[in-house]
Curated annotation (Swiss-Prot):
Belongs to the CobT family. SUPFAM superfamilies: Nicotinate mononucleotide:5,6-dimethylbenzimidazole phosphoribosyltransferase (CobT) (SSF52733). Keywords: Cobalamin biosynthesis, Glycosyltransferase, Transferase. It comes from the Bacteria. One of its GO terms (molecular function) is nicotinate-nucleotide-dimethylbenzimidazole phosphoribosyltransferase activity. It comes from Shewanella sp. (strain W3-18-1). HAMAP family: CobT. This is Nicotinate-nucleotide--dimethylbenzimidazole phosphoribosyltransferase. Pathway: Nucleoside biosynthesis; alpha-ribazole biosynthesis; alpha-ribazole from 5,6-dimethylbenzimidazole: step 1/2. The keyword Cell cycle does not apply. Catalyzes the synthesis of alpha-ribazole-5'-phosphate from nicotinate mononucleotide (NAMN) and 5,6-dimethylbenzimidazole (DMB). Its EC number is 2.4.2.21. GO terms for biological process: cobalamin biosynthetic process. The gene is cobT. The keyword Transferase applies.
Amino acid sequence: MSQSAVSFQINPVSKVQEQSIQQKINLKTKPLGALGQLESLALQIARIQGADQPYIANPTMLVFAGDHGIAAEGVSIAPSEVTRQMVQNFAHGGAAINVFCRQVGFKLEVIDCGILTPIEGVKGIIDQRLGAGTGAIHLEPAMALETVDKGFAMARDLIERHHQTGCNLVAFGEMGIGNTSAASAIMAAIMQLDVIDCVGRGTGINQETLARKLMLIELALLLHQSALTGPKEVLACLGGFEIVQMTGAMLAAAERNMLVVVDGFIATAAALVAVTIAPNVRDYLIFAHQSEEQGHLRMLEFLQAKPLLSLGLRLGEGTGAALALPLIQAAVNFYNQMASFSDAGIEAVV
């Protein structure tokens, strides 16, 4: 049975209240613009929610996991088996993302989108498998086009479940050995860049491995050149099961007027695809950080994004997105709680 095409209806964020929101920010007891990027973040959140008192409710970190056929060629510092081991680590609470989520108050959910071997009977892992790892993209498509739509449908259901609990902010992380290769290929295809401008060292590969990674991604783009006719086709030819479901979940979250917090290089590649499918998604995206991966800055610039943090992170998992949550909450809190000049009886400062 074929999967019917999944589409999303995403409204642009209204600009009707933009002037009044900006005026409220300007009249807080501070010089104009003195809270820097927190001010533009507060403006974005207030516009999305269209409320006098914006708020963060049930913030949820979604970590999508999947394996990649190209990893068998040795493009990473670790073999594919590490994907499964790390997913188990997430489930047992022992990874960096677990530590940070506990610290900042994120609910964490781990989604198996298609690691090589499923993990049976472990609480906290959501089964949304699209297969047992993707095809090796330098030899064949990563997946069928129908699989992309199946992944989008699963992702929409996932977001709907969280939306029903009152969640209004979702953050996106991932785990998948080889997924920087898939993300680099997606970036090159959509942004029409040379591979060398998109490929980096991932979690820390040496020069020899980097050269092999470059060659294989070049081969993949050459192999699928005629099939890369749209963003879904790019995902089918070059993507990963976790990247597909991240893309679909970002689209679904924007459709539900939720705040979407984007982590690093892989998550930004998913955001790039989502914005290509539905440009209005861009209004809902909050970019957590600029990672150490060399292509990430180029993608952020392409998306006209100014990330909140720059910490030299290159771990993935959603770690940067988790660390950004206190800043997002701070933007909401100053908007709601900080006195205006008239409230405080202070003469306005320009």
